[in-house]
Amino acid sequence: MKFLVENINKNSGRLGLLDLKAAGGGIQLKTPLLMQTTKGGSIPYLSADLFENYVQNKNGQEPVPVLLQLTLSTMQQMAESLALWPASLSHYLGFPGQGNVLLLRDPCESTPSGGNDRDVAPIFTRQGKESLTPERYMEIIASFKPDIYQGLCDADTNLESSKKRVQKSVDRTERFMDYIYEQHGKLQSTSSSLLAPIVGGYNIFARTQSIKHARQQPEGKYSGYILEGFHNNGLSATALDGSQLLPIVEHCVKQLEENKIKMMPGAYSPLIILELIHIGVDVFDTSYAYCAAVNFKALVFNYDEKSIEPRPTPFLDITDEAIKEEFVPLLDNCKCLTCQKHTRAYVHHLYKTNELLGPILLMIHNLHHFMGFFETIRSSIAQDKLPKLIDLVCKQNGDSKVDYSIEKNVKVISKAVVGKGFETTTES
């Protein structure tokens, strides 16, 4: 993996190019980059063909290559099969020619806290908790042969974590990484690139310690950084307070080399993503679009500076009875398959009748909208207009700041009244 910084604007962040040589011949990806979040190696609700033909391929143009975000917590059962697989990991998953990065935890689901023993890191799978030693982790990496993988770390921290818990996360990560750095050189035949984890919660001193440990490694030991330990994944990431998060990230970025890529996985809100890009973070994922879809929300926030219509909410609630007779697209002027072929009333009907097509159409729209958002971000940086985009996304042509946090939708379809509507449950 090679990363080239192409352009840095003082007011707008930076543009870069990520060159992956291991993805079946080599691909180039522009940054700021949006990884495609997967579950079990598949994009949620979408087959590989559906994604390529109706999301990745826009207006009949040649599909732009993507970087698949894979998570060990949803794929650990594949290690034995992949050890015998002769081709690339992306080819095994049905996405030949695409890049991939293997992370530990699923950013779409809340990660349980605890289980952090001295010499193991826990991952929580569908089969329960599995404890990973550094030795076992590197065996899995040798089987998966990902294009990029993150170093083993203890990222079980958030804003409420105690100083003791934060320090333990840093110390444990250093012990894990001492072994990972040593063994990574023996994986060179796989062409896998390593991301050094930077942990330490919201403690500047702990973050600095984590950075120093990574930077004291010999040149070439790793290819970039992954900043973790700010949240416990899932919906919690959508509600993070930028005033507390951004100063810590900015402190970290200033201490890291400019020529190394910086990744922050998690369902960060569009506004937080823009602020992080302004600071210098390069890679994010689509878990926010997924979290919105599974909670019956279509993304409709505005990022087109030509539009002057105020939007007090960034979402359209598909379960809202008010849209059951609205025969208009989910979002005006949207070019996705869902908005071109279907209406709000139809998608509402699909959810009301519990049809599988409902989440498929909603996921297509949300991914299309979020990918278009990143295209606009790159264009804004090139024109040094990112501050204007931040202001637009923040206020949505209104007078006050818009709330982008996603709350769990507790509306369910009663089996007794399927087709008649939704009712509210008290389930947490």
Swiss-Prot record:
- Kindly list any coiled-coil regions of this protein: none
Under Gene3D superfamilies, the record lists: Queuine tRNA-ribosyltransferase-like (3.20.20.105)
Q: Where is the signal peptide?
A: none
Entry binding sites for Zn(2+) = C334, C336, C339, H365
GO MF annotation, one: metal ion binding
| Subcellular locations according to the entry | Cytoplasm
One of the protein's GO biological processes: tRNA-guanine transglycosylation
A cellular component term, taken from the record's GO annotations: cytoplasm
Cofactor(s) demanded: Zn(2+)
Q: How is the cofactor bound?
A: Binds 1 zinc ion per subunit.
The alphabetized UniProt keywords are:
Cytoplasm, Metal-binding, tRNA processing, Zinc
Q: Which PANTHER family match?
A: QUEUINE TRNA-RIBOSYLTRANSFERASE ACCESSORY SUBUNIT 2
Q: Matching NCBIfam families, A to Z?
A: tgt_general (TIGR00449)
Q: How does it assemble?
A: Heterodimer of a catalytic subunit and an accessory subunit.
This chain's function reads: Non-catalytic subunit of the queuine tRNA-ribosyltransferase (TGT) that catalyzes the base-exchange of a guanine (G) residue with queuine (Q) at position 34 (anticodon wobble position) in tRNAs with GU(N) anticodons (tRNA-Asp, -Asn, -His and -Tyr), resulting in the hypermodified nucleoside queuosine (7-(((4,5-cis-dihydroxy-2-cyclopenten-1-yl)amino)methyl)-7-deazaguanosine).
Q: So what family is this one in?
A: Belongs to the queuine tRNA-ribosyltransferase family. QTRT2 subfamily.
Q: What is the protein name given in its UniProt record?
A: Queuine tRNA-ribosyltransferase accessory subunit 2
